[in-house]
């Protein structure tokens, strides 16, 4: 695959530091969010052709000019999707969809609290939460980030540095689902 775009995921940083839940065999190339153009194919590959635009789901090797990926991890890109969006789409949306759709079983009318709402995973949680019919409360640090999450559709936006954050959340009513896109002290308070 001629790599056209690769996202740098937090898991890549953990892998680099040796603190990820799985430890790959050394040496390895970071980069698990990848999109590109098929440059060559193996003799048993029948569902892709040279020149196809694809995204690769999972694995490593994206922070390179070219990479060799198992065909089972590759999907064709829609014509309207650019390479950057394709690389960023996979893990952020996949993580939020798994958490909100399968684990939390989000349904219309639920109140969803998204901590770390201005990052890639947090923004996808806002979007998917709204699509699932939830009332979404987004929490982020600072005015600029708060404006971003409001534009993405959060019904309520709160600053994580607000010393009265917990009381402001209580004023908004009950919370059915807490989605923590970052981890840390806020989750304990929530």
Task: Annotate the PLM regions.
Residues 4-5, 73-103:
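Extended, non-globular alpha-helical segments
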Residues 49, 79-84, 105-111, 173:
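Short helix-loop-beta connector
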Residues 58-71:
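A structural motif shared across PLP-dependent enzymes of the aminotransferase-like
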Residues 137, 152-190:
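Glycine-rich cofactor phosphate-binding loops and adjacent beta1-alpha1 units
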Residues 5, 52-53, 66, 111, ...:
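Residue-level marker of beta-strand positions
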Residues 11-17:
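Cytochrome P450 core scaffold surrounding the K-helix E-X-X-R motif
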Residues 87, 93-163:
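Mid-domain Rossmann-like dinucleotide-binding core that forms the NAD(H)/NADP(H) cofactor-binding site
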Residues 1-7, 19-61:
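Glycine-rich beta-strand-centered segment in the early N-terminal region that forms part
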């Amino acid at each position: 695959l001629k790599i056209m775009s690769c996202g740098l995921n937090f898991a890549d940083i953990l892998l680099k530091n040796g603190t990820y839940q799985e430890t790959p065999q050394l040496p390895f190339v970071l980069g698990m969010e990848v999109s590109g153009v098929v440059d060559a194919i193996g003799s048993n590959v029948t569902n892709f052709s040279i020149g196809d635009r694809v995204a690769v789901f999972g694995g490593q090797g994206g922070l390179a000019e070219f990479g060799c990926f198992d065909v089972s991890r590759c999907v064709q890109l829609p014509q309207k999707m650019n390479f950057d969006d394709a690389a960023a789409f996979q893990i952020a949306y996949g993580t939020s969809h798994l958490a909100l759709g399968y684990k939390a079983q989000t349904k219309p009318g639920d109140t969803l609290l998204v901590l770390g709402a201005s990052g890639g995973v947090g923004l996808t949680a806002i979007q998917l939460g709204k699509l699932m019919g939830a009332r979404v409360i987004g929490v982020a640090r600072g005015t600029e980030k708060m404006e971003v999450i409001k534009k993405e559709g959060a019904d309520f936006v709160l600053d994580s540095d607000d010393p009265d954050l917990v009381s402001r959340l209580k004023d908004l009513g009950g919370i059915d689902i807490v989605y923590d896109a970052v981890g840390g002290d806020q989750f304990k308070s929530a």
